[in-house]
Every structure is written in C-alpha cells, then in structure tokens.
Amino acid sequence: MNQRNASMTVIGAGSYGTALAITLARNGHEVVLWGHDPEHIATLERDRCNAAFLPDVPFPDTLHLESDLATALAASRNILVVVPSHVFGEVLRQIKPLMRPDARLVWATKGLEAETGRLLQDVAREALGDQIPLAVISGPTFAKELAAGLPTAISLASTDQTFADDLQQLLHCGKSFRVYSNPDFIGVQLGGAVKNVIAIGAGMSDGIGFGANARTALITRGLAEMSRLGAALGADPATFMGMAGLGDLVLTCTDNQSRNRRFGMMLGQGMDVQSAQEKIGQVVEGYRNTKEVRELAHRFGVEMPITEEIYQVLYCGKNAREAALTLLGRARKDERSSH
C-alpha cells in the first residue's frame, strides 16, 4: 500500500472499530486501523484477527494495522473515529495537528459529551474548526454480526453532501451492508445516545421479570422521549422512525448482545451498579449517557420520565423495581401529549 492512498483510516481498534475496518476492507478498499495500545496492535497484526472481540473473523489482506498515529493519519484523507463518547473530544484534539490538509472526519461513536451533554458535532467543531467536513454513521449494528458479513443497515448524515456521497459509496455493500443517507445531522446523532439509556431500562424491566408487554411499552414510550428531545433540538421527527432511531432502539433493547441491556438486567435482578459494570467488563455507554441525556433534557425543558427514573437508579441508589412502580404510578394522560 502506498503510504497516502488508503480509502479510510479507522481510529479505534475495539470490537466496533475493527468490525467497520473489516467491512470496508472486505469491500475492496485499502484500510488502516489504528489503536492506542501498540501491544494490542502488534497482536492483531500477528494473529490477523481480533481474537479478543471477533475471534472467528480473519482480516482481509487490504486491512493494515498501525500503532503510529501520525502514519495512520497520513494514510488517508478520510478518518473514521470509533471510540467511547467520554474520550471523543480528547481523541479529536490529539489527531487535529496530525491530520492532512484535505482531511474529512466521520464518527461511529454513539453518545454525548461527558459532563456537558453536548452533541458530538459541537465537540468536533470546537476541536477541529469549521472547515473540516463532518459526518456520523449510526444504526442497529452489533459488531459480531457486522464483521461476520450478516445483513446490516445504518443511517449516514453529513455537513457536506460530497462527503456523504463518498462515504455512502465506500461503505455500501449490496451483499450485506446497506447505508441510508439522511440530511438530519442532529437526529442521527441523538438517537444513538438516547437508545442506550432506554436499553438499560428495558434490561431492568426484564431483570425484574415484568415480561414482554412491559418491555414493549417501555420501548414505545422511550421512542416518544427520544422524539420529544429531538424536536426540542431541531431534529426531524421522521429520523427517529429510521435506522438511527427506532432501528437501533429495538435492537439494543431486545438482544442480549447489548451491553446496556445486560447491564440493566443485572440491576433489575438486584445487583449494584458497580458490580454490574465490572461483570460486563467493557464500556457501558448508557451509564454515562443517562446523566448526559438527562442534563440535555433539563436544559431544553423536555420531560423524560423513563430517563429520570433510570438516572435515579444509576446515580441515586433507587431500587429498579421502585423506579418501575414510580413510572407505572404516573398520572393518566393522552398518549400523544408532550410530557
């Protein structure tokens, strides 16, 4: 591979970053995958697979491993960031001075900025300036299924139409990976943050033993909370009926591959927050997202009762069953009301 002709540099060699890199490489593109731990990258290069997360998926020959950040960023103008939301801003500030003058950046990170609750687009603009084209991909994607080449569909939104078209062409694979463009940059970002919160709630409900009826009601009312918050931020309500909204919400709330759902189930079964996090063993994005989404809702005056009760369980020591009963005991109202 010529040092500067890769189609994409992927920043983040966890399960999802690796799965996206494999998908791009399988599409016939030269891809560079960078990770912050040189030993981990050396292991990936030696094994030609990510044995920790995706042990049965060999790397295509066009997937190249790199532990030097400057070299990785020089390889392509297109940069795909796949890191946890709480380090997103830090990573962008780290890569900014090393990016090519013609760089364009897309992220698959789901969530909001830690502590502030800001959308990641605002974090990116602050870190990178106003000139770099930005994009986000989001939707119902478990890394194992994506890497295995099972059929998957996502949404893509960008600040730049040319970048959006190029990304859609790079990512789209008629055999297994369908990419829908969407002009709603805010909505595509927001869905991925709120669904993490609701998935914890769905897990709690199942952990308590409330059954399928309760889980479905929670998903439906969670979608209403997502839509209300989106409307307050200027998103298109139709976005939340698509891949980045309802699609991701249903997947994360109903399948045990979801760390957020499994975390919630443990809480519903009586485990404390710290023990549940330790048992999961990987980042539970919804834990931080709950605090961030709640802050965003308060800032915009949006009532989100499910999010509030999950926050009370995670940060204030409330019992999961008690939180569920609080929701069930709320005053009667019109299903279409704004609160």
Curated annotation (Swiss-Prot):
Source domain of life: Bacteria
- Keyword Cytoplasm: yes or no? yes
Looking at the UniProt record for this protein, which Gene Ontology cellular component terms does it annotate, in alphabetical order? cytosol
Per UniProt, which keywords does this protein have? Cytoplasm, Lipid biosynthesis, Lipid metabolism, NAD, NADP, Oxidoreductase, Phospholipid biosynthesis, Phospholipid metabolism
MF term (GO), any: NAD binding
Q: Which HAMAP family match?
A: NAD_Glyc3P_dehydrog
Looking up SUPFAM superfamilies in the UniProt record yields: 6-phosphogluconate dehydrogenase C-terminal domain-like, NAD(P)-binding Rossmann-fold domains
What name has this protein been given in UniProt?
Answer: Glycerol-3-phosphate dehydrogenase [NAD(P)+]
Q: What is the lineage of its organism?
A: Bacteria, Pseudomonadati, Pseudomonadota, Gammaproteobacteria, Enterobacterales
List the catalytic activities from the record. sn-glycerol 3-phosphate + NAD(+) = dihydroxyacetone phosphate + NADH + H(+); sn-glycerol 3-phosphate + NADP(+) = dihydroxyacetone phosphate + NADPH + H(+)
Q: In which residues is NADPH bound? A: S15, Y16, H36, K110, A143, R259, V283, E285
| Protein activity control | Is allosterically inhibited by G3P, the product of the reaction.
Biological process (GO), any one: carbohydrate metabolic process
Pathway connected to this protein: Membrane lipid metabolism; glycerophospholipid metabolism
Catalytic site: K195 (proton acceptor)
What are the subcellular locations of this protein? Cytoplasm
Function of the protein: Catalyzes the reduction of the glycolytic intermediate dihydroxyacetone phosphate (DHAP) to sn-glycerol 3-phosphate (G3P), the key precursor for phospholipid synthesis. Is able to use both NADPH and NADH with similar efficiency. Can also catalyze the reverse reaction in vitro.
